[in-house]
Amino acid sequence: MSDYILELEEYGVAFGEKIILSSVNLKVPVVGNIVLLGPAGIGKSTLFRSVCGINKANPSFRTWGKAKYLGDDLDNQLETPALVSQNVKLMMSSILENVVINLPERQSLQKAQQIDVAKRLLERANLHELTERLDDNVIDLSLGLQRHLAILRTAVANPKLICIDEPTTGLEEDYVEHLLQYISEESKRRAVITILHNQEHAKKLEGMVALLSDGWIHEYSIDKDFYNEPQSKAGKQFIKSGSCPVIGPEYDEEALQYMDMDLIELPPPVPKEAKEYVSDALGPRNFLWLKNGILAGTPQPGIVADIDYDLKALKKVGVTKLITLLEKQLDPEPINNYGIENLWFPIDDMQAPDINEAIKWCKRVEKFMAEGEVVAYHCKAGMGRTGTMLTAQLIWEGMAALDALETARKVEPRWVQSETQIKFLEDFWSAVHDLKDNCAL
């Protein structure tokens, strides 16, 4: 048995031609805490989403190098690291439901037993104040309590590795220490990697520190060594200023003449595999599969790129039905010219549809998929209304509301954008549940 639960060797990630991570080397012990630091926007979240298997929903996603989890190739594992996404908010259902949803033995427990287990888990997580509020809706809790509960909910499933993305961002300082203490306690039971930007917050998590920039790990050391005496140029700059110069994995050599090379360590050469890229069916930017090759969400064609480029990309991934959720109908002619049928189901921005209308559309989409059609929903950005209807489809097919939202947000954490949409999904589940119960009578 290896001493490491996750081993990355020359691991890289790209989306199409865009290389985000070029050559990451990292070994994660079976138990303990690692803080992942680095400038904003350089791929820390991408690393998490890649090793947790979430980026596979993007048809342009590709990797190279070696990634081993639990001693075997990461791609061969049914179990993956668990992710607590960046800026967790707009959670659904009651406190009780969130605590017990991932319990392996949940189905064998009576309601009273579930309540007893939930209270014990909340106590262990230092969420004592919630033990007598099990029926309260999570969406009504403070942001700090929502983040805390999201980590507990993930830990309840007993994953071997939890990746926590910026848990303290936007929190009141008086709650930060409480949350970090809980993360420290979890790291005594399993491996935990936490992305943080605030160094003072990072220093409260004892363990290892990894500094990621320009597509590779510049430094990986014991926390006190890193904060007191960093060895890399990037580490010294990060401790001094909270950031470090960024040139990217594929840097422009001409641009280097305008930079202070005393502050910069050139990244390793981009591996040959990273450059061996042949364009295939990639889909538009931010296109994501909820069901691979069957059901997807995407932004409005023409919003991110030229409309013909986006429509050609939709055709390449096989989309045959494009459902528009905008208030105003699109011109169907250019869409039809690519062999894609455009359908229109108007929903106001940040709002939710009528329940009966949503049921009709879920029935239609279910029929489309059964007939071999490939369906994509879109609103403007492909997030709120799109995520709501995709989640509704999962509910229509039999998932509980919270399970459906969790499944959708594992693909795109920003799917479902408003309290109105959250409330709709809960009401939609009740309506579908009642409808199918009545049909069974």
Where are these regions (language model features)?
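Conserved beta-strand-loop-alpha-helix hinge in the C-terminal portion
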Residues: W216-I239
